[in-house]
A protein has these predicted regions:
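Glycan-processing catalytic domains of CAZymes
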Residues: 22-365, 373-400
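Bacterial Sec-dependent N-terminal signal peptides
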Residues: 1-23
Length: 400
């Protein structure tokens, strides 16, 4: 369990107020949810805008800030609103020890940002930088984000990149981005490498007993459409079913449109909310209602069903324990088995981004269903036919 301490520490920090107020109750688990390209410096850096971020279900704010004073203000605003900030500024790189010593005890600090999507040649310098930061602060993790698999010529080259990153930079967690939902004309489809990327990252993280962080795309650009609830559910529940311990959205605030035509982020460039803001808020609330299933969970098996299963995945040939029947009638589904604090779970996800799934699932008397509001009901209270909207999940919990 030592490997998930950085994640759990961030999560527990966000519930410290409620724990103090309710000393005799266990804190409600909270999955860390990170807003990439968060609130910018300047006129929008206010308590009200940070509270708006928190109200949408985020726990970590990562603003791209290029002045020390702006980074300190972000720490202050995060502390005031129960958030944590991923800290970045030029001084963190030019004078890491002195800068870290100034901020390491700040209540708004969550992590230190190093770099996005480094190449192999960048890793030795990043390792030296990380060691300098860690020499001054062993409590808050350094953070960087890795490339997706399709940035490499082959899956094996990607695996080598991950392994080289871990051997050299050796951070407490892995993080990578992969934005799978594409649209060409009226056709919406998943990148063929999406599930392969999850397979690789989940496996590499488990082999090293480290958590991994994964993404959902919240901002349209290029061939990536304006996200719907179905699009976000597919990405986020897939991340969680594969064992991700922190969820990240790219982006929260709309970046400049000059290069990538970013548009319809949850918060647009003028500071107004788009319709995506309410979708993100809804999905985050839904995910946190079942956080006790996923936060701290360990993957025990991952399989797919369907006439054709995705690249890099494995076909389900044996039913999970207590599942008597599972028939998806040739459609694709992910079947993830998790264990968390002595309790076993089976997560069944519709892997289509466009089509509902009719799944026939029967269990024995040792299973409960974990409903979207987090409540539990005996699985025997329901019929065997379950209709899952695109990306959605059924969650079964073994009765203790």
């Amino acid at each position: 369990m030592k490997s998930i301490i950085p994640i759990m520490a961030i999560s527990m920090a966000l519930t410290s107020v409620s724990v103090t107020a309710r000393k005799h109750k266990e804190p409600k688990p909270c999955i860390p949810i990170l807003a990439w390209y968060s609130i910018p410096a300047g006129e929008f850096a206010t308590v009200e805008r940070y509270q708006e971020l928190r109200d949408a279900g985020f726990t970590l704010s990562f603003s791209h800030l290029y002045k020390y004073e702006d980074a300190i203000k972000a720490l202050d605003l995060c502390a005031q609103t129960g958030l944590k900030s991923v800290f970045m500024c030029p001084e963190l790189e030019s004078n890491p020890e002195a800068t870290v010593n100034k901020v390491k005890n700040h209540p708004g600090l969550g992590a230190y940002f190093l770099r996005d999507e480094p190449s192999n040649k960048d890793l030795p310098a990043l390792a030296q930088w990380a060691r300098r930061i860690e020499s001054a602060d062993k409590e808050h993790p350094c953070y960087l984000n890795l490339l997706p698999v399709h940035a490499f010529a082959s899956s094996q080259e990607y695996i080598t990149h991950i392994q080289l990153f871990d051997s050299l930079v050796h951070l407490p967690q892995f993080s990578y981005d992969h934005y799978p939902v594409n649209q060409v004309g009226d056709s919406v489809f998943l990148n063929a490498q999406f599930w392969n990327n999850l397979e690789i990252m989940s496996r590499e993280a488990r082999q090293r007993n480290k958590p991994f962080w994964a993404f959902a795309l919240a901002t349209a650009h290029g061939s990536y459409p304006i996200p719907t609830a179905d699009h976000l559910r597919l990405q986020l529940y897939a991340d969680l079913a594969y064992g991700a311990q922190c969820l990240q959205y790219f982006t929260y605030w709309n970046p400049g449109t000059e290069t990538w035509n970013f548009h319809q982020a949850p918060i647009m460039q003028d500071g107004l909310r788009s319709s995506v803001y309410e979708i993100v808020k809804q999905i985050n609330r839904e995910i946190q209602a079942r956080a006790d299933v996923f936060l701290g969970a360990h993957v025990t098996s991952l399989f797919h069903t369907g006439n054709d299963i995705p690249m890099g995945t494995h076909r389900l040939t044996t039913l999970p324990q207590h599942i008597l029947k599972l028939d998806t009638h040739g459609q694709g589904a992910l079947v993830s088995c998790l264990t968390n604090n002595g309790t076993n779970y089976v997560v069944i996800q519709n892997t289509s981004v466009t089509k509902p799934l009719q799944a026939e699932v029967s269990t024995d008397q040792h299973m409960k269903m974990v409903l979207p509001d987090g409540s539990r009901q005996p699985a025997s209270s329901y019929g065997s036919l379950h209709i899952l909207t695109p990306g959605n999940v059924l969650i079964f919990e073994e009765v203790q």
